[in-house]
Curated annotation (Swiss-Prot):
Cofactor(s) this protein cannot do without: FAD
Enzyme class, first EC level, given as a word: oxidoreductase
Name of the protein in its database record: Probable malate:quinone oxidoreductase
One BP term from GO: tricarboxylic acid cycle
EC number: 1.1.5.4
Cysteines joined through disulfide linkages: none
């Protein structure tokens, strides 16, 4: 499509064609079908940046295997609260996706989600003791009842043969397994959702770059848009704007001038993965196996050996190997980081630089790591790995949040944060992990912040779409079991044995 051809006015403008914008658009179409929506994506297709299947690990993050969501306290104890919160969030995502499948809004769920057990795997006494403590903290909870624990290498070999084959039998190892884990192709899901938006009357514009945004005199927002291929420029007015442009969100949020954007900065972290598509190898592994991060490593750098399903083909992914680039998007400019510096965020950014020297040292070490050293890291999880069977691919950028802190000046925040103007006319999402897996609860939070009056009237519809909405499933075992079974049927997933019946 060439430059904006249908409208210069919209009730809602979505900036960015990733999973967040697509999810928000789907919610709005379900809740307010008469509202007009225009989506603008700078690339030629939806879901090509961080939502793309090879730009993220594709883990349906439910805290079943990610050890950084339940770290050990100084006394060795494990607090399960954050893991429970993330799992509750993922249950909402499952319910919304199930509703869309059951309503024939999107196609076969096999195109975007598949059952892949989630495992944690650790080596050595200290890590094994921690994993056992974690298991004992999580197992009594409804949402983790299916979890199994073992230190028996023969049992681990039944779950994931590659991580045991060739390993020293005297080495102490430990593993947990949750059979209900999932692998998600967020690129495919994003394209299903944007397809739904188009078929229901929304205008979806690819190859359109939103270059500026400012308040309109009569209310709402005026957006400047460029069509790079034709060189055309144009404008569109919106009553509400969502800046869901991934790493590109910070620049546009700063351009809006809203007070709520002051003091935020971004710290980009890049990553690489090894990918294997050899059927003789991929057929021997059906799990997402997460380990422990190195000292000083950011949370998104936890090593893991994953089964992936992309375009119906099974493959293996190992990594990530962290790196550093000043780009905020995989396809953007090296000037992104320096151009994001403002008088209001320079102190937080300098404070973060001073207080995170271990992270800086880790990134320098990772960038300097040679190919053979990367293969050796792979062999910690797959002892018999041959480097020639694996290709190195570059993943998407993760822009972590830098924000003001009253005592420290600034802190580096791992996670996501919804930012909305006081009048609710513009909202944005900053940050990363767990990100896409929790797109549904994140966008519900944004709807609540941006449309507080409408939100009260949406409660019944939200409950219809997601029967567990507003309920802590961990405290309602019968409803949790019912919804696990019903969403598994809708999404064609397996049900964890421990929760059946």
């Amino acid at each position: 499509m060439t430059f904006i051809s249908k409208t210069q006015h919209a009730d809602v403008v979505l900036i960015g064609g990733g999973i967040m914008s697509a999810t928000l658009g789907a919610f709005i179409k379900q809740l307010e079908p008469t509202w007009t929506i225009s989506l603008f994506e700078r690339l030629d297709e939806a879901g090509l940046e961080s939502s793309g299947p090879w730009n993220n690990a594709g883990t349906g993050h439910a805290a079943l295997c990610e050890l950084n969501y339940s770290p050990a306290a100084k006394d060795g104890s494990v607090d399960p609260s954050k893991a429970l919160h993330i799992n509750e969030q993922f249950q909402l995502s499952r319910q919304f996706w199930s509703h869309l499948v059951d309503s024939n809004v999107i196609g076969s769920p096999k195109g975007f989600i598949n059952t892949v057990p989630h495992m944690s795997f650790v080596i050595g006494d200290d890590h094994s003791n921690f994993l056992k403590n974690r298991y004992e903290a999580l197992k009594p909870n409804t949402l983790f009842r299916s979890m199994e624990y073992t230190e028996d290498q023969d049992q681990i070999a039944k779950w994931a043969p590659l991580i045991v084959k060739g390993r020293d039998r005297k080495q102490r190892v430990a593993a947990t397994r949750a059979a209900e884990g999932t692998d998600v192709d967020f690129g495919a899901l994003t394209r299903e959702l944007t397809g739904y938006l188009q078929s229901s009357g929304a205008e979806v514009n690819y190859g359109h770059d939103v270059t500026n945004i400012h308040r309109a005199a009569g209310g709402g927002w005026d957006l400047s848009i460029k069509h790079p291929k034709s060189g055309e420029h144009g404008r569109i007015h919106a009553k509400f704007v969502f800046v869901g442009a991934g790493g590109g969100a910070l620049h546009l949020l700063q351009a809006s001038g809203i007070p709520e954007s002051k003091g935020y900065g971004g710290f980009p972290v890049s990553g690489q993965f090894f990918r294997c598509t050899d059927d003789a190898i991929t057929s021997q592994h059906s799990a997402k196996v997460y380990g422990q991060a190195s000292v000083g490593a950011p949370p998104m750098s936890v090593p893991h050996l994953d089964t992936r399903y992309v375009d119906g083909k099974r493959s293996l992914l190992f990594g990530p190997y962290a790196g550093f680039s000043t780009n905020f998007l995989k396809t953007s400019s090296y000037l992104d980081l320096p151009l994001s510096i403002r008088p209001g965020n320079i102190i937080p950014m300098l404070a973060v630089a001073k207080d995170n020297m271990d992270l800086t040292a880790y990134l320098i070490k990772e960038v300097a790591k040679r190919h053979e050293a990367k293969v050796e890291a792979l062999r910690e999880y797959y002892p018999e790995a041959a480097g020639g069977n694996w290709e190195l691919i570059t993943a998407g950028q993760r822009v972590q949040i830098i924000k003001k802190h009253p005592q420290k000046g600034g802190v580096l925040q791992f996670g996501t944060e919804v930012i909305a103007s006081r009048d609710g006319s513009i909202g944005a999402l900053l940050g990363a992990s767990p990100g896409a897996s929790t797109a549904v609860p994140i966008m519900i939070e944004l709807l609540q912040k941006s449309f507080p009056k409408n939100f009260k009237g949406w409660q019944s519809k939200l409950k219809d779409m997601m029967p567990g909405y507003g309920v802590k499933l961990n405290e309602n075992p019968d409803l949790a079991a019912e919804l696990e079974a019903s969403t598994a049927r809708s999404l064609q997933l397996e049900v964890a044995n421990a929760i059946q019946g």
